[in-house]
């Protein structure tokens, strides 16, 4: 039987001049895209601020929002979300401008707790307003008397705000969990 056998010729490669400059194999990235102080994190904060501001503007432009407590609650939660996202976006911009890392355990814990609280509050506000919107639109069939399209748009933007906040919370929470292990 005549089978070809590959011949392996070893290459002589010079060792690196400074082996300490190379990262150890298997090291995880410290700054995941979306973490505080990264361009991805700033992008998520801008999205959160944008969705919350649109929800706030659309809901407050209707004349009937003050008569329904769930709509007032949605406005309150979007104001809270706007303040939180703007504050953290300013911190992200500062960190990017001065090239500082925000991987301090206390800072990431603060961001994670703040993101978790604002996510839950924003989600509850969007769900409450969605329930009333469905009640008005589908059950009571009162859209001729109410601006249902505005209510639905504000609720949709409230949910989009929640969905854009979730990656920030999960990345910060993962960072806290991985730093303790």
Curated annotation (Swiss-Prot):
<dbReference type="Pfam" id="PF04535">
    <property type="entry name" value="CASP_dom"/>
</dbReference>
<comment type="subunit">
    <text>Homodimer and heterodimers.</text>
</comment>
<keyword id="KW-0472">Membrane</keyword>
<protein>
    <recommendedName>
        <fullName>CASP-like protein 5A2</fullName>
    </recommendedName>
</protein>
<feature type="transmembrane region" description="Helical">
    <location>
        <begin position="39"/>
        <end position="59"/>
    </location>
</feature>
<keyword id="KW-0812">Transmembrane</keyword>
<dbReference type="GO" id="GO:0016020">
    <property type="term" value="C:membrane"/>
</dbReference>
<feature type="topological domain" description="Extracellular">
    <location>
        <begin position="137"/>
        <end position="153"/>
    </location>
</feature>
<feature type="topological domain" description="Extracellular">
    <location>
        <begin position="60"/>
        <end position="77"/>
    </location>
</feature>
<dbReference type="InterPro" id="IPR045009">
    <property type="entry name" value="CASPL-5"/>
</dbReference>
<keyword id="KW-1003">Cell membrane</keyword>
<feature type="topological domain" description="Cytoplasmic">
    <location>
        <begin position="175"/>
        <end position="181"/>
    </location>
</feature>
<dbReference type="GO" id="GO:0005886">
    <property type="term" value="C:plasma membrane"/>
</dbReference>
<feature type="transmembrane region" description="Helical">
    <location>
        <begin position="154"/>
        <end position="174"/>
    </location>
</feature>
<feature type="topological domain" description="Cytoplasmic">
    <location>
        <begin position="99"/>
        <end position="115"/>
    </location>
</feature>
<feature type="topological domain" description="Cytoplasmic">
    <location>
        <begin position="1"/>
        <end position="38"/>
    </location>
</feature>
<feature type="transmembrane region" description="Helical">
    <location>
        <begin position="116"/>
        <end position="136"/>
    </location>
</feature>
<dbReference type="InterPro" id="IPR006702">
    <property type="entry name" value="CASP_dom"/>
</dbReference>
<keyword id="KW-1133">Transmembrane helix</keyword>
<feature type="transmembrane region" description="Helical">
    <location>
        <begin position="78"/>
        <end position="98"/>
    </location>
</feature>
<comment type="similarity">
    <text>Belongs to the Casparian strip membrane proteins (CASP) family.</text>
</comment>
